[in-house]
Design a protein with these regions (language model features):
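ATP-dependent NMP and nucleoside kinases share a basic, alpha-helical "lid"
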Residues: 92, 98-142
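Conserved nucleotide-sensing/catalytic segment adjacent to the nucleotide-binding pocket
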Residues: 54-103
């Protein structure tokens, strides 16, 4: 019907200027990457992994800041990838300000990141968590080299969740 078609066109035009940002936070091994991949498969939205730009194994706090400062900014959004082999900045990854985004990684749900996402359009924040031992096992199974860094990273996660993280819209805790 013509009326339904007109409503669809109006909504599509409106959406073209208001992208959706989904911020998915949680500690290592909680299921953020799996969840973001499942959501992207259903929506075709671009996924940005904080793992791509944390500046090294001591860079959780800086990586968290980069979400608002670079990834979600309304002019020239993107980020400098981190070259984990060279332990130095890599190439620039450009983003389209109009794209719906799924931003996943520990450090993604902060007051600054939520505010930056709201500047772009609609934002939904998610926290995923589970038992530490199971998370550790999952994280190391995915990336065996991570075992030597798990406790270093976990200390940064604890500090982040105690001091910087914002309350998420949705909390998914598995056991």
């Amino acid at each position: 019907s013509s009326a339904a078609s007109d409503v669809y066109k109006r909504q599509a035009r409106k959406r073209a200027f208001k992208p959706v940002t989904v911020l998915i936070d949680g500690p290592s091994g909680a299921g953020k990457t799996w969840t973001s991949a499942a959501l992207a498969e259903r929506t075709n939205w671009r996924v940005v992994h904080l793992d791509e730009f944390y500046p090294g194994w001591h860079g959780l706090d800086k990586g968290s800041d980069m979400v608002a400062e670079q990834v979600l900014r309304t002019m020239n959004p993107g980020y400098w990838r981190w070259d984990w082999e060279a332990d130095s900045p890599g190439d620039w990854a450009s983003l389209d300000v109009r794209d719906d985004l799924i931003v996943e990684g520990v450090g993604s749900v902060t007051p600054a990141n939520i505010a930056a996402a709201k500047e772009r359009g609609t934002v939904v924040s998610v926290l995923i968590d589970g038992p530490r031992d199971q998370r550790r096992e999952r994280a190391i199974a995915r990336e065996p080299d991570y075992e030597q860094w798990f406790e270093t990273w976990e200390a940064q996660e604890k500090d982040y969740f105690a001091t910087k993280a914002a309350e998420a819209d949705l909390v998914w805790e598995w056991s």
